[in-house]
C-alpha cells in the first residue's frame, strides 16, 4: 500500500497543530516518524486513520483520494494503529483479545472457538510467537501483549501498521524479537510507521525517516544518508552540542546506604551506597528487580531483611511518609500512575508533599503556596500558561518536570529517579539532565534507574548492574562501556 | 507551546471551571423560580426558614458524604449510624444521663462506628461499597436489638435538648444554624487545610498520594469517622425533633445524601467536587420536597420527580464534561 499525505493542516480550537505536513509511505518500508513531543506526530497519524479530520490537505492511498471517517474504517482498509497504551483486556484470554469485536460465530450466534483458535494459531506461527491462547492477557508480559496487538492487526489483513513508541516498556530480548517480526513483515510487503524517541532503534530498523517540528515536516530522507546528530538537530531546530551536559562531581560523605537488603521473590542481598553530590546509575534488564528495590528503599513495600543507613545512622523506613521525612524523594517510572494527579492543577501537584511547610497554623497560606509553586515552575522551566493547568494537558517532558518539582520542593537529600526520561523528548531530556547536575552541585545524592545504556553511561559517576535480583557488579564511570554493562546485566562476568 | 496557544488553553480551562462551579447554582436558581411562580407562598420567610430546618439533617450527612466521595469511596451506613446512635442517645437520656452530655457521647459513638468503616476499608482492604453495606446491616440490626423494635420515648423536658431540634435562635431554626456552622467549619477544613488537600489527592490518585508521603490510611479513617460523627449529630437533631428515637430512623438517608453530593457536581470517582456544591444539592432536594408539598403533589409522584431531576442534573453534567 502506498500512502501520500499532502499539505495537511489541522487546528484544535485556536491551536494550529499541523501546518502543511506532507508524508509519504511506500509499500514494504519501515518509516520512522520523529519529532519532539507536541510536534504533531500522533495527530498526523490520527488524521490518516480517521480519528480526526484534516482542515485542509489531501490523502491518497494507492493513488486514489481516500478519507476514512473513523479508525475502524481505516482498519478495514488495512491500516492498523498500535497505540503506546495497548488495547488489552487483561481479564480476558489471549484468544478473546485477538477477536474482540470481530468474533466469529455461527448463524445461531454461538461463538466458533475452534475456528478462531485455528486462525489465531496460524497467525502466531507466522510470527513465531509461542503463547497459550487460553491464558489471561493480563498475565502476559508487555512484549507478549504487543505481539497480541500485532497479530490482531495482521488478522485484519493490515498492510500498514503504525506503531507508537512500541519499545517503551520492552526488554532487550523482546525488542530484538519485535525487530525480527518487523523485518519479516517488511518482506511480505507490509509497511510500518515507527514512532519512537529512541534514536538507536531508528537507525537499527528503519529505512526512511520523516522529521517533524512544530507541526511542519522538516525533512524526509533515507536513514543511510543521515546520522544521529543531524536528526537531533533537525528535531530541535538547534544544535545540541552534547547530549549529556558535563559536570565535575564533588563527592561528599555517604548519605544513604543499604546493607544486605532482600525482598522475597524480588531481590536478594543488595548492598550499595551513594554519596552526597553523586549520581549512581542502576542498570539491568527489565524485570531484574531494580524498580522493586527502589520501592522497598522508599518504604512503599517492606524489606524482608536488611538495613538502611542515612547519614551514618542506622534507621528504618516503614512507609513513604517516613522516607519523605528523612529527606528521600522518589520519581517513579510511571508518572501517570504513581507520580501525578492528572486532573489536578500543577500547583496542587507540586504543593502536595510540601503542604506542611506553608501551613504554619494548620491553614494553608495560599500566597506562600503560590510563590513556592511559581518559583519551582520557573526554576524547572515548566511550559504552561498557568499553574492552574491540569497535569493531564502537559506534554510528557513537562509532566515529568512537575513530578521532579514536587520533590525538589522538600529539599531532598537523596533523590531516587526511576527511568527519569522515559517518554520525554530530546529537548526536555537535556533539561532534566542539567537539573540533575545542578542538584548534585547542591549536595543531593541521586540514584538513577535507567534502561537506556547511553543515559547510564552519560550521567552516572558510578554504575551498579543488577541481574536477577542481585547486584552483579559495580563499575566506575570511567571504566564503563556498554559491552561491560550488558555482560554483567545478562549474568556474565 | 506558543504563548497564543497557552492563552487560549488558559481561557478554555477558566471557562470550564466557571461552568462547573456555576452549574448547581443555576439549577437551584431555576428551580426556585419555577416553584415560586407556581406557588408564590414558597418565598415567604416562614416557609424558607422551615425549608432550612428540613434540610439540616440531610445537609449534615451529605457534608460528611462529600469527604468520603472525594476520596473515591462511598458510605452506605450513614443512615444506620444515625439510627443506632439516636437510639443509644435516647436510651442514655431515659436512664438519666444529662441530654447535652448524651448528645456529645452520641457523636463520639457515631465517630467510632465510622472509624470501624474506615478501618475495614483501609486495613481490611475492603471495597467501601461492600464494607459499608455490611456495617449498615449490622448497625440496623443492633438498633432493632437495642430498641426491641419500639420507639424510645419519655425523653423528658430538658430545654437545651428540645431547642436542638425544634428551637429558634434569633428567629432562625437551631438545626439550620447547626448546619451552617458545620458547613463553615468543614469548608475551611476542605479548602484551607492540608487535610482537605490530601482528601482530594487520595481521590485523584491514591498511589501518587501514598508515594508523596501522605498517610492515606489515617486520612481515610478520619474521613469515615467524620461521616459517622456528622450522621450522629443529624440523628440527635432528629431525635430532638421527634422527641423520640425511632428504630427505623434514617432509612434511605444515605441515598438522599449521595444524591445531594452528586447534584452538587462532585464526581463519584473521587478527586473532584466542592462542599458548596453539596450545600446547593441539599437545597435543591429540599426545595423539591418543600415545593412539591406546597403544590399538593402526592408523595408518590414526589419520588418520581426527584429521581428525574437527579437524572437530568447528571446528564447535563456529562454533556458539559464531554
Swiss-Prot record, chain A:
Query: What are its E.C. numbers?
Result: 7.5.2.7
Q: Tell me how this protein sits in the membrane.
A: Peripheral membrane protein
What GO cellular component is one of the record's annotations? plasma membrane
Keyword Cell membrane tagged: yes
What residue intervals traverse the membrane? none
Q: Domain of life, per the record?
A: Bacteria
* Record key words, sorted: ATP-binding, Cell membrane, Membrane, Nucleotide-binding, Repeat, Sugar transport, Translocase, Transport
What are the binding positions for ATP in this chain? 35-42
Q: Where does the record place it?
A: Cell membrane
Its catalytic activity?
D-ribose(out) + ATP + H2O = D-ribose(in) + ADP + phosphate + H(+)
Q: Which InterPro entries match?
A: AAA+_ATPase (IPR003593), ABC_carbohydrate_import_ATPase (IPR050107), ABC_transporter-like_ATP-bd (IPR003439), ABC_transporter-like_CS (IPR017871), P-loop_NTPase (IPR027417)
**Positions of the ABC transporter domain:** 3-239, 246-493
Q: Which GO terms describe its molecular function?
A: ABC-type D-ribose transporter activity; ATP binding; ATP hydrolysis activity
- Describe the task this protein carries out: Part of the ABC transporter complex RbsABC involved in ribose import. Responsible for energy coupling to the transport system.
Quaternary structure annotation from Swiss-Prot or TrEMBL: The complex is composed of an ATP-binding protein (RbsA), two transmembrane proteins (RbsC) and a solute-binding protein (RbsB).
What protein name applies here?
Ribose import ATP-binding protein RbsA
Q: Which organism is it from?
A: Bacillus subtilis (strain 168)
Curated annotation (Swiss-Prot), chain B:
Q: How does it assemble?
A: The complex is composed of an ATP-binding protein (RbsA), two transmembrane proteins (RbsC) and a solute-binding protein (RbsB).
- Is Disulfide bond there in the keyword field? no
- Annotated Gene Ontology MF terms? transmembrane transporter activity
Q: List the Pfam families hit by this protein, alphabetically.
A: BPD_transp_2 (PF02653)
**What are the TM regions of this chain, as residue ranges?**
22-42, 48-70, 77-94, 101-121, 126-146, 169-189, 219-239, 294-314
Organismal lineage = Bacteria, Bacillati, Bacillota, Bacilli, Bacillales
Q: Which UniProt keywords apply?
A: Cell membrane, Membrane, Sugar transport, Transmembrane, Transmembrane helix, Transport
> Is Transmembrane given among the entry's keywords?
yes
InterPro entries, per the entry: ABC_transp_permease
Role = Part of the ABC transporter complex RbsABC involved in ribose import. Probably responsible for the translocation of the substrate across the membrane.
Q: GO terms for CC?
A: plasma membrane
Tell me what topology the record assigns in the membrane: Multi-pass membrane protein
Q: Which organism is it from?
A: Bacillus subtilis (strain 168)
Q: Where in the cell is it found?
A: Cell membrane
Question: Highest taxon of the source?
Answer: Bacteria
Can you tell me which family this protein belongs to?
Answer: Belongs to the binding-protein-dependent transport system permease family. AraH/RbsC subfamily.
Where does the UniProt entry say this protein principally localizes?
Answer: membrane
* Record's protein name: Ribose import permease protein RbsC
- Could you list the residue ranges forming a coiled coil in this record? none
